[in-house]
Each structure stands twice: as structure tokens, then as C-alpha cells.
Amino acid sequence: MKLSNDIITIEVAAHGAELVSLRKEGCEYLWSGDPAYWNRHAPILFPAVGKPYNNELHVDGKAYPMKQHGYARDSEFECVNVAVCECGSVGTMRLIQSSNDAIRQYPYRLGLEVCYRLSGSAVEVIWTVENLDERDAYFQIGAHPGFLLPDYHAEAATHGFIRYYDREGNPVGPVMVSALDDGNRVPRPIVNIADCMPITADTFAHDALMFEGGQVTKAVLCDKEGREVLGVDCPHAEAYGIWAPHKEGCPFVCLEPWCGICDTKGFTGDISTRQYIHRLAPKEKYTFAYTIEVYR
């Protein structure tokens, strides 16, 4: 699916309903998916964000397999609508329920529609989750877009900056209360993160940075002079992840608003007690949204 207006053009793959290109005036901003570093672009994390402990979710005492970040990113979607309206170009994709064995293994039947809407130099991504089951259903959802570092040179000491904002639009120096150990959270407070954080070769030496409790709802990628290049804003975000593979010469970074988070190490509780879990009654729908805006 391809959408464009006078300023930006995006492309979305049927596989994972994944944004695979974001261009402004011919300049690409989204990571290419080069498998030498990371073979994805902007996967949708659903119905799990991060890694469940032991790759299992527990429902009423029974364990169900669930890999890191869920099944949506490896499932097929169908395009159900493309239109041009007063607010801009709009395209919607719907999860094909039969496209992945992991969908059938999940203990709840959930529908997922993903709408991409262009407005000026911004892309709004709207997720609508529907409970197709006859009992309450539980899920998490999140975004994982990767963006090219502006004017990247591997030999540079600093590759740019990330500026953090809270829900009210105020710059914030967030506090990390946990870090990752084999994909699960363990207590490891880090309190000296500035509201404008430099990106260096060692920023992600210990995996992703995670900011919990809604401290951060918007992260902005800045160039080496501190000028804002693009931002990812999600008023719903309960947690926010910043990540890149710790590999020499990695030229991108991911800005990840989450409505959910990975399990703490050793967690084996019921799915209903997972942190930042969302519950839907039968036939109920819920909508989440985030926006990518290109500034320059």
C-alpha cells in the first residue's frame, strides 16, 4: 500500500502491516531493514510487547506459547481501504486471522486494524483492537519504528541526540528503573539521563533503554547540532523504549512507544496481572494511536 501527499510518501507492506518507507521530498527517513543489523523496519508489537518470561503467557493456570513482541509482525494483512479526503490520504489494513499459527494458539480471538493517515509532514498510525471472543480478552500493543541517523558517520563520537517530552509537551529527563537481562526486566535504576541524550557507540551496550510509568510519551531524534529532525508522539504510551542493535557502524535508532512492556524476570502470573495489560469485554473495541512527524 502506498500513500502520498504534497510533502511525504509512505509505503506499507501486507506482511505485518509494516511501514517500510517514509520519504519527504525524496529523502528516506525509515531504516532499510538490512539484515546485517536488523531485518525489520517498523514492526507492530501485538498482542505482546517485549518478551514474556520463558516465552509463555499464563491464562487460568495454563501456559500458552508467545514469542517476543507477539504475532502481528509475522502475520499477513489485507488492504481494506485507500482514500483521499480533506484530512489527507488514508489507508487501512486488517489482520488475516488464518495467516499465522500463532494467532490460533493465542487464548483469545482478537481483531486488529491498522490505519495510516497522512497530514502535512506527519503520519498518524491508528490501531483498532476488537475482542472477537465471548469472554474478556487481554493484550498489549506497541510500535517499533527504526529511523536513519542524520548525516551518519561511523567514526563520529556522537551520532545525534534524542530529546524526551512528557504528555504535556515539557522536556523531561526520564529515570530508568529497570534494564533488560535476556529480554526480561530486572531492577537497575539509572537516574542521570538528560532530556537531550547523546547517541554514541555505547548507548545500547546493555540493550534497550526503557522508560516506564508514562514519563515519556514523545521522543525526538536530533542531528549532531541538536536540531530536531523527526518525532514519535504517543499520548497513550505507558512505557517508551529506545533501542538499536549494539553493532559497529549501526546507522539507525528505534523510537518505540508502548502500551505494554516485557515481563520482569521470573514472572509466571496470570496474563491479567501483567504490567500495562489491556482488557476488552466481548465485542468491545479500543483504539490507540501514535504519530511520526518529520520536521526537516
Segments and roles (model prediction):
Residues D136-Y138, G146-L149, H153-P235:
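Active-site/ligand-binding surface loops and adjacent short beta/alpha elements
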Residues R94-N100, W258-G260, E293:
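Generic short beta-strand segments
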Residues I8, K24, H69, D74-V82, ...:
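Acidic/His-leaning functional-site neighborhoods
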Residues G91-M93, L112-V114, V125, I141-A143, ...:
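Hydrophobic residues positioned within well-ordered beta-strands of beta-sheet architectures
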